[in-house]
């Protein structure tokens, strides 16, 4: 818990640091955002199969620096409560040291602390109505904390309690991000915004241990090594509602 708070504090300090440096350009905006996220799991190898879309949440701090009238650098701090549901094949040894495979149906959840870095392109205002539309594209750099899973096996029901598997899932998260939205100016210094963003991980979420490798040995020799790695990737469509000052 202390490590998580320290990490969030570091992200906040970085975000506020950008604020202090940007005010001299008189184009900085800072605010808050919140909204749901619709998550599903992908695999570039096909070894993991998506089993449906799960609903998570995201909230955080938003920071924008306008270096031109219609162009801004977007950053801040995102706290994403990710969810997922996928299945894969694992293996176990029987009494004769023969590898038997079985299906694992896995639901998982985790918290990802992320710093986005995006280019925002904004339209001009249309007429007298103070509404502008925008598109944004960039990347997200994140840290995954306390990923938990609940597994159902062939003939074994899923437990009610999620178990922590931090060593199995990588802490590193790197994602491509793109989105569209609209912002409404309340006055010269305050505006509301609504955005729909797509996020796609491009770094494997699974470490090179079980279940990327069957975890069973005969003597000192590992057997049943998985030929095709899971290569798990998180996808999300998120809706954000926020306010900027």
Annotate the PLM regions.
Residues 5, 15-31, 223-229:
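Outer-membrane beta-barrel biogenesis signature
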Residues 21-62, 236, 242-245:
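Short glycine/proline- and aromatic-enriched beta-strand/turn motifs that initiate or cap beta-hairpins
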Residues 41-50, 83-110, 145-172, 206-230:
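Flexible, solvent-exposed loop segments that connect beta-strands
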Residues 24-28, 65-153, 234-245:
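Gram-negative (and chloroplast) outer-membrane scaffold detector with strong preference
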Residues 57-59, 115-119, 174-180, 184:
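Transmembrane beta-barrel strand/turn architecture of Gram-negative outer membrane proteins
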Residues 2-8:
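Sec-dependent signal peptide recognition
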Residues 173, 178, 183-245:
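Predominantly the C-terminal beta-signal and adjacent terminal strand-loop region
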């Amino acid at each position: 818990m202390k490590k998580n708070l320290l990490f969030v504090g570091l992200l906040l300090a970085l975000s506020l640091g950008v604020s202090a440096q940007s005010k001299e350009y008189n184009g900085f905006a800072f605010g808050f955002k919140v909204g749901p996220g619709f998550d599903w799991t992908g695999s570039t190898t096909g070894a993991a199969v998506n089993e449906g879309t799960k609903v998570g949440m995201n909230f955080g701090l938003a920071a924008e620096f306008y270096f031109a009238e219609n162009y801004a650098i977007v950053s801040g701090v995102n706290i994403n409560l990710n969810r997922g549901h996928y299945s894969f094949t694992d293996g176990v040894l029987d009494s004769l040291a023969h590898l038997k495979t079985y299906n694992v149906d896995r639901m998982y959840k985790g918290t990802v602390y992320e710093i986005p870095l995006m280019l925002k392109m904004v339209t001009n205002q249309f007429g007298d109505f103070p509404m502008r539309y925008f598109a944004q594209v960039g990347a997200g750099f994140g840290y995954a904390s306390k990923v938990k899973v609940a597994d159902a096996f062939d003939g074994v029901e899923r437990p009610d309690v999620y178990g922590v598997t931090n060593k199995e899932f990588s802490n590193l998260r790197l994602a491509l991000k793109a989105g569209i939205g609209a912002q409404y100016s309340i006055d010269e210094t305050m505006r509301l915004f609504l955005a729909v963003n797509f996020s796609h991980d491009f770094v494997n979420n699974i470490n090179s241990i079980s279940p990327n490798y069957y975890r069973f040995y005969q003597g000192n020799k590992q057997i049943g090594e998985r030929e095709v790695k899971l290569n798990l990737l998180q996808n999300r469509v998120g809706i954000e509602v926020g306010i900027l000052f």
